[in-house]
């Protein structure tokens, strides 16, 4: 029987940070928990960052993941938004590393590709596939679904069939190794 690995996925945001916790046993994925960390929109940025760090620390303490995965920042049209997102992501990374968790990072494109099968998938498609893959009875909030999708991406890339068939870590694209 395969050992169980618990993975925490984080979708960082300065207003809402989504998280998802899954267990992976062999090729099977099991839902553990998910939720959203909401920060007060009118609070100073430093206070919002503190909320993110504190709540991610609580999630780690309660659910005891062995690995973590965080979605990378994409460059937005608005530089100020990109900077705020980067700071929220930094807070998430700091919280995870302070708990001695190994952290992997994935782009939004990689997450959508892993979960939906195409990198240009809509948020609703990601939510739908998260529900299907984890056998959920309801649809999680969008940010929580994104956190679960990040955790699933990590599981699929590191614990699933793809990792077993491709132990070198090389990417397969259009039938070729790159």
Curated annotation (Swiss-Prot):
<feature type="active site">
    <location>
        <position position="11"/>
    </location>
</feature>
<feature type="active site">
    <location>
        <position position="143"/>
    </location>
</feature>
<dbReference type="GO" id="GO:0048476">
    <property type="term" value="C:Holliday junction resolvase complex"/>
</dbReference>
<protein>
    <recommendedName>
        <fullName>Crossover junction endodeoxyribonuclease RuvC</fullName>
        <ecNumber>3.1.21.10</ecNumber>
    </recommendedName>
</protein>
<comment type="subunit">
    <text>Homodimer which binds Holliday junction (HJ) DNA. The HJ becomes 2-fold symmetrical on binding to RuvC with unstacked arms; it has a different conformation from HJ DNA in complex with RuvA. In the full resolvosome a probable DNA-RuvA(4)-RuvB(12)-RuvC(2) complex forms which resolves the HJ.</text>
</comment>
<keyword id="KW-0227">DNA damage</keyword>
<feature type="active site">
    <location>
        <position position="71"/>
    </location>
</feature>
<dbReference type="GO" id="GO:0008821">
    <property type="term" value="F:crossover junction DNA endonuclease activity"/>
</dbReference>
<feature type="binding site">
    <location>
        <position position="71"/>
    </location>
    <ligand>
        <name>Mg(2+) 2</name>
    </ligand>
</feature>
<dbReference type="Pfam" id="PF02075">
    <property type="entry name" value="RuvC"/>
</dbReference>
<comment type="similarity">
    <text>Belongs to the RuvC family.</text>
</comment>
<dbReference type="GO" id="GO:0003677">
    <property type="term" value="F:DNA binding"/>
</dbReference>
<keyword id="KW-0233">DNA recombination</keyword>
<keyword id="KW-0255">Endonuclease</keyword>
<keyword id="KW-0479">Metal-binding</keyword>
<comment type="function">
    <text>The RuvA-RuvB-RuvC complex processes Holliday junction (HJ) DNA during genetic recombination and DNA repair. Endonuclease that resolves HJ intermediates. Cleaves cruciform DNA by making single-stranded nicks across the HJ at symmetrical positions within the homologous arms, yielding a 5'-phosphate and a 3'-hydroxyl group; requires a central core of homology in the junction. The consensus cleavage sequence is 5'-(A/T)TT(C/G)-3'. Cleavage occurs on the 3'-side of the TT dinucleotide at the point of strand exchange.</text>
</comment>
<dbReference type="InterPro" id="IPR002176">
    <property type="entry name" value="X-over_junc_endoDNase_RuvC"/>
</dbReference>
<feature type="binding site">
    <location>
        <position position="11"/>
    </location>
    <ligand>
        <name>Mg(2+) 1</name>
    </ligand>
</feature>
<dbReference type="InterPro" id="IPR020563">
    <property type="entry name" value="X-over_junc_endoDNase_Mg_BS"/>
</dbReference>
<dbReference type="GO" id="GO:0006310">
    <property type="term" value="P:DNA recombination"/>
</dbReference>
<keyword id="KW-0540">Nuclease</keyword>
<keyword id="KW-0963">Cytoplasm</keyword>
<dbReference type="GO" id="GO:0005737">
    <property type="term" value="C:cytoplasm"/>
</dbReference>
<dbReference type="GO" id="GO:0006281">
    <property type="term" value="P:DNA repair"/>
</dbReference>
<keyword id="KW-0234">DNA repair</keyword>
<dbReference type="InterPro" id="IPR012337">
    <property type="entry name" value="RNaseH-like_sf"/>
</dbReference>
<keyword id="KW-0238">DNA-binding</keyword>
<dbReference type="GO" id="GO:0000287">
    <property type="term" value="F:magnesium ion binding"/>
</dbReference>
<feature type="binding site">
    <location>
        <position position="143"/>
    </location>
    <ligand>
        <name>Mg(2+) 1</name>
    </ligand>
</feature>
<keyword id="KW-0378">Hydrolase</keyword>
<keyword id="KW-0460">Magnesium</keyword>
<dbReference type="InterPro" id="IPR036397">
    <property type="entry name" value="RNaseH_sf"/>
</dbReference>
